[in-house]
Amino acid sequence: MTRVKRGNVARKRRKKVLKLAKGFRGSHAILFRTAKQQVLKALKYAYIGRKNRKRNYRSLWIVRINAAVRPYGITYNEFIKQLKNSSIALNRKMLSQLAILDHSVFKTILDSCTPGFK
């Protein structure tokens, strides 16, 4: 059997994991074995968090649009249906931004897609 020298490789691998674990509390930032476990867990949580962020923003946009159309006597659901029927291609993020920042443009969109709800 030949001798396998992998000191550099092992050190680089450990340093990489410990660098990712920087800022963790206690032994999770110092000991390689626990740091490795915590890094894997943190990466898993980060992945889940990226998915949840998209979900949260979409629900926030829906709430904002609903709050903007309610004073005109229409619900969010009816508004989206009327948008689809009048083939206005604006996504929820854009509609939410218009409702907050440029209310007059949002009102014209509302009037153009819902003529019966005035």
Curated annotation (Swiss-Prot):
Highest taxon above the source species: Eukaryota
Disulfide bonding pattern of the chain: none
Classification via InterPro entries: Ribosomal_bL20, RIBOSOMAL_L20_CS, Ribosomal_protein_bL20_C
Tagged with keyword Transcription regulation: no
Gene3D superfamilies: 6.10.160.10, Ribosomal protein L20 (1.10.1900.20)
Cellular component per GO, a single term: chloroplast
Major site of localization recorded for this protein: plastid
Key words, A-Z: Chloroplast, Plastid, Ribonucleoprotein, Ribosomal protein, RNA-binding, rRNA-binding
Subcellular location: Plastid, Chloroplast
PROSITE patterns to which the protein is assigned, alphabetical: RIBOSOMAL_L20
Gene Ontology MF, one: rRNA binding
Keyword RNA-binding part of the UniProt annotation: yes
One of the GO biological process terms: translation
Annotated function: Binds directly to 23S ribosomal RNA and is necessary for the in vitro assembly process of the 50S ribosomal subunit. It is not involved in the protein synthesizing functions of that subunit.
Family: Belongs to the bacterial ribosomal protein bL20 family.
NCBIfam families found in the cross-reference section: rplT_bact (TIGR01032)
Protein name as catalogued: Large ribosomal subunit protein bL20c
Originating species: Gracilaria tenuistipitata var. liui (Red alga)
